[in-house]
A protein has these predicted regions:
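Mature catalytic core of soluble alpha/beta enzymes
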Residues: 3-5, 9-22, 26-350
């Protein structure tokens, strides 16, 4: 067996971030394909493309023999959607919405905002896509992060309330959004899952039958390995750089998404720990004893939304939500390293 570990190269790591997921692929090195009716040649070693997009390390490994340009074009979708969903990019569609430059929005932005509002409601506002007025005060990507002024946070909280956002569609199909002046939508917690699903659809449309898409904390599989076995997805243990894994999940044609306190964080001068998952009620990071939530689902969009939603709901309410949903499983990890599993999560664990 040939064990391959995919993780973010040291020169691409930000000092306050660590890659959420590693992909572990075990190739059995079969000498011939048997019983395979695929129209395209299945590979034992992948065709790979890598890049740095969406503020993370991204990679596609195709186990179908296709032109490498197909994979590069698929990763190019990251740029396309960033110009729609980015809160900070001044040329993006969302930026223009947040700055009241437009009310007419694209199908893609309408779809993602509608989804964000649904999960904001599902969490009773514990997750809120209007957190942008607060999140723009926190910069977890700078080399010198600092805690925002408390009065600035208090002022920003006056502009956090997802119920003030409304969507509509004209008879001709044109979508519109209405948000109060001063409000700022932030779709960063859910956009990568949506983009991963779009990349998967593009690859399938272009003949890819077996592949792994890795957008940092979002891993999405197409099909299974050429011998019919599952892909093995290793969920990195929080706050480690030594290759320790929280779990190794066995999936095919499914998604694995993790959200946690270790993705972006810093320590203040007095040693206080601050991470990027902010509480819409306080403007400060959540402190609910969770450090990671990993979601197993068929769609990465759903996994992205639920990983954040379940994190902010906390262990008890988050677990209740997952166990009420069909076809979705989760693994929760608390700060002491204890792991908690949804009803059928262990079916994906060795």
């Amino acid at each position: 067996n040939n064990l391959v570990i995919l993780q973010k190269p040291a020169h691409l790591r930000h000092r306050t971030a660590s890659l959420v997921l590693c992909i572990v692929i075990i190739n059995c090195m079969l000498s011939a394909l048997t019983g395979c009716n695929s129209k395209k040649l299945a590979l034992s070693s992948p065709i790979s493309v890598t890049d740095y997009k969406l503020n993370t390390y991204v990679q596609i490994d195709s186990y179908t023999n296709v032109n490498k340009n197909v994979l590069s074009d698929a990763l190019g979708l990251c740029d396309y959607y960033e110009h729609i969903f980015s809160r900070t990019l001044e040329t993006s569609e969302l930026y223009k919405v947040n700055t009241q430059q437009t009310t007419a929005i694209s199908d893609e932005l309408y779809e993602l905002i509608e989804l964000g509002l649904y999960y904001s409601q599902l969490s009773y506002g514990a997750f809120d896509i209007t957190i942008g007025s607060v999140s723009r005060l926190w910069d977890f990507n700078t080399d010198t992060p600092d805690v925002p002024d408390s009065s600035a946070i208090a002022d920003a909280l006056a502009y956090v309330d997802y119920t003030k956002v409304s969507l509509s569609t004209d008879n001709d199909g044109t979508h519109h959004i209405s948000i109060p002046d001063g409000y700022c939508l932030d779709l960063g917690a859910i956009a990568k899952g949506y983009i991963a699903d779009k990349i998967k659809a593009y690859l399938i449309d272009n003949g890819v039958e077996r592949a792994i898409i890795n957008l940092g904390g979002n891993v999405l599989c197409i099909g299974q390995k050429r011998n019919g076995s599952d892909f093995n997805i290793a969920v990195k243990k929080p706050f480690t750089e030594t290759g320790e894994y929280m779990e190794v999940l066995h999936i095919n044609d499914y998604s694995v998404v993790s959200s946690g306190t270790y993705e972006r964080y810093f320590y203040s001068d007095d040693g206080t720990f601050y991470h990027h998952i902010l509480n819409p009620a306080t403007g400060y990071p959540y402190d609910n004893n969770l450090c990671d939530v990993t979601i197993i689902s068929s769609e990465s969009t759903v996994g992205d939304c639920l990983s954040t939603t379940c994190f902010v709901l906390g262990l008890d309410d988050g677990m209740k939500l997952i166990n009420s949903l069909e076809g979705i499983e989760a693994v929760f990890m608390t700060n002491d390293g204890s792991k908690y599993y949804s009803d059928n999560a262990k079916a994906y664990i060795n």
